[in-house]
Amino acid sequence: MHLFILAAAALLGLSAAQHNPHTKHGRTAMVHLFEWRWADIAAECERFLAPSGYAGVQISPPHENIVINSPWRPWWERYQPTSYNLCSRSGNEHELRDMISRCNNVGVNIYVDAVVNHMCGASGGEGSHSVCGSWFSANRKEFPTIPFTHWDFNDHKCRTGSGNIENYGDADQVRDCRLVGLLDLAMEKDYVRGKVADYLNKLIDMGVAGFRVDACKHMWPGDLSAVYGRMHNLNTTWFSGGSRPFVFQEVIDLGGEPITSREYFHLGRVTEFKYGAKLGTIFRKWNGEKLSYTKSWGEGWGFMPEGNALVFVDNHDNQRGHGAGGASIVTFWDPKLHKMAVAYMLAHPYGVARVMSSFRWDRHFVNGKDQNDWMGPPSHGNGVTKPVPINSDQTCGDGWVCEHRWRQIKNMAVFRNVVNGQPHANWWDNQSNQVAFGRGNRGFIVFNNDDWNLDVTLNTGMPGGAYCDVISGQKDGGGCTGKLIQVGGDGRAHFKISNRDEDTFVAIHAESKL
């Protein structure tokens, strides 16, 4: 019995450690460089992410995937593995290793999007139409490069007529049947667990800091626990001995289904999809929502416990209307609202925060649905992903949006670092859509999302002095390229924000003091 208790405590310790993102140098926020090439991510870590205080990068799935030509090379083909070879349109294994090393060397962690619930779609055919030529047969459920055979899939367990998930009210179906026709791995099999763990461990040994685990709702927590338990500790070249991989699990839980996020809390952090969905309705002022209602933002809004949450305004799915949140999600297509919503997230202490970095595509709406939501990254005619060019004004070209480079978002990533560990404090609101709050005595932010001007004197909790607003500009030598905010010896400051300003919010922090 005593040994059992010790073993249970050890397992609990392992999973508790999997909630830690292992960020370095006081950095806090990660960015999802969606569909970027490994060579571009390596360069971005060195030239921009590290100097700007970003903590890490979520990368697109690095495994080999099926090539889909109809529609032409969609983004979602990356979520249909055909082998665990580290070869994708983002680059080969050598380029992946180079990126991981170069980012780690400047203190930027790499988190891998791990697709382990399934292989490609059942209708994927047979042949070598994988990104790097690996042969597979979706018809016969054979993936010899790994190898998986028909014995390694869940078809015998699924009890629906189609073999697909038909009813999200049935937890067995959601976990044992095919998600949109994708061949569902039998993760209760020790052999399958071993192959998945081998794939994750190869990446851990290369130096990644952890994983965003795709489609966790569709896997049994016990199976995931068994796989995570086989993961190696992080590479001691860059991480302290005994560090466990950071795990954040994609579970879409907006309520109303039998499977809940809570079932996965003990295994690592979980994506809080309610966060971006609610923040979107608040900033859009839909359904009578007001910014003033966010005084209790976080657990007070029915979100998961803070220590379990990975938060984001939008992600690669729901910015296209997939996943969760619907039309309320605020994306780069609404830049003014998006900057405000991301700033609110980065200023607020709840959760580990992730910033989205997107690519543009030609939207084509028919009856409210984007017919082009499948479109892949900017690419050449042969399907090869284009590099990310950096313009002279530090924005990106060729269809890459690079929200993480927008001044307002980049400077709020720094704000989050500066105020890290400080309590939410000095709340003010006008009972409508003007609010302000601080983080201890290290930072203060003011929002005006009303259709009229804000003109108010507030207690910032900050030491007296002149501060540079990091939204309209930033410190430049001894000066400031944006608004100057004067804080008196009593901590009070006067704020004026016109509802017609380019950005209707202001933020100051300890390191923006002149």
PLM feature segments, named:
Residues S128-R178:
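Core domains of carbohydrate- and sulfate-ester-processing enzymes
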